[in-house]
């Protein structure tokens, strides 16, 4: 079946090319880049071997790639290394010993809006703390290579410190996002078979205390096998329930650890698991994605160089929570692997004012900013005056991650945040890939920018867009995103479920990794990811991606944000409905509602016109910034909301319900 774009289904700027003067010397012709790219995928093993040689290995590999048992590929077989050594030890042997590694900022502020909770850690500080925590885990709890540790912590320095300490020993981490419920936490503890859980008493979120230890206690009523719980007193709460013989205060344990404690880094095999990270599926058991050590390190190292062009004087800020894969790769490992200085922030992006993030960029002189399209669209709604209050001139690179970025959001951020002087890209990758796969690469060769595109595949990644039969889709034709050859950071499987690994990723198109995304490759070879193939509305047999509809709505000057879901229809099978957040100063009206429906009709086609448009002041999002479309669909269909523990603001669902009920009542009266 053809997935060709319908007439005006998408007005993506395929032919628009932007070259700014500040980066002009870095630009290369598109054809020249793809000639180089073709050489890297045709000589895959020698290319990735040359990258791997730039890292320090305790023992070199015997074989670059073992492809004898596809799709269970192994990279740098026989090689031994340690992530903690690469991220910390090797830097303290150089001038970077006293360089700042982490600038951490908590959420609380004083009456003038200045943060009251800040910490600075040099690479030597980090080295000492990682060793002390590793010593504590090994001596007090007998943690050894292969043990699983679940971390249920907020965005505090102890989270990356503990991950590095665990990897130092050879333990396997399972970080669970601190917004997950007790049931979700229990499920992940059971599946990973963790015997230790590390958590905190609580943390700050939008000025409120979020209690964590009680969630762990509730989870352990259902989870089995946990022997010990270590509790970090982040807030110093006095009424935290502690179970004798199982629960231990972090600070009391650390009091007994010598300041010069040292644990020898375990030289683990390249294919040794470093972490398990669970993907949040809409149905069924969460998938425990397993990543190795050597391949992941090489992939993250390469992308830090190519995509972020890291220099010694850079201040790097990735806004992702460490509970997600972006935080693993580009908060914990990536910046520290490069010896960079990074910013970590605990709280909400717009608390107590919508300029919190911009004040952070100004305060620390952030040069590289990695964030989500959802966050950018939220700030668009607040208006330009908030970023204009701050000096953002230090920014030289901005990248987005997590979902496709609409061309309008791209242009806004490029102009308002980057002053049209930054290199700006939209990276594509996923939990399963381990690191960035498609992106502009200002640290390597910068091809002309196009608003909203993900750009070309990075060197060493053979990416394509294929049709229903697995054949390459022609330029401009919508298809499925696949990766045709193995890559170093690829997942090593699903924890304890090899059959599901094969079925989920390798059975749809045999011999190719199926990403589950719709995409278009334009005539220049740029990839435009359109969103999940399962985020599709089928109207009278026509497939419509939610991304295309949302992009059409956001392109209207009155709209700040939108979310589109499909609801059952007796005639068409399914029809799209839209929840729309208007820009400040724009009043909702029936006339505007009609105008927006007509705008979508003109932009995409009659088939895409929303059956209803609901005006809301906020959309339900996770704390990582992703729109929770399933909640909007539940509101519209009357279905149970399900688990809402990751919801940032519960009033957003009530807002959607109110808007929906108002329209229903109005329709009943007419």
From Swiss-Prot:
SUPFAM superfamilies: Acetyl-CoA synthetase-like (SSF56801). CoA binds at residues 205-208, 326, 601. GO terms for molecular function: acetate-CoA ligase activity; AMP binding; ATP binding; metal ion binding. Its cofactor is Mg(2+). Keywords: Acetylation, ATP-binding, Ligase, Magnesium, Metal-binding, Nucleotide-binding. Its EC number is 6.2.1.1. The modification N6-acetyllysine is found at residue 626. PANTHER family: ACETYL-COENZYME A SYNTHETASE. HAMAP family: Ac_CoA_synth. Catalyzes the conversion of acetate into acetyl-CoA (AcCoA), an essential intermediate at the junction of anabolic and catabolic pathways. AcsA undergoes a two-step reaction. In the first half reaction, AcsA combines acetate with ATP to form acetyl-adenylate (AcAMP) intermediate. In the second half reaction, it can then transfer the acetyl group from AcAMP to the sulfhydryl group of CoA, forming the product AcCoA. This is Acetyl-coenzyme A synthetase. It comes from Pyrobaculum aerophilum (strain ATCC 51768 / DSM 7523 / JCM 9630 / CIP 104966 / NBRC 100827 / IM2). The gene is acsA.
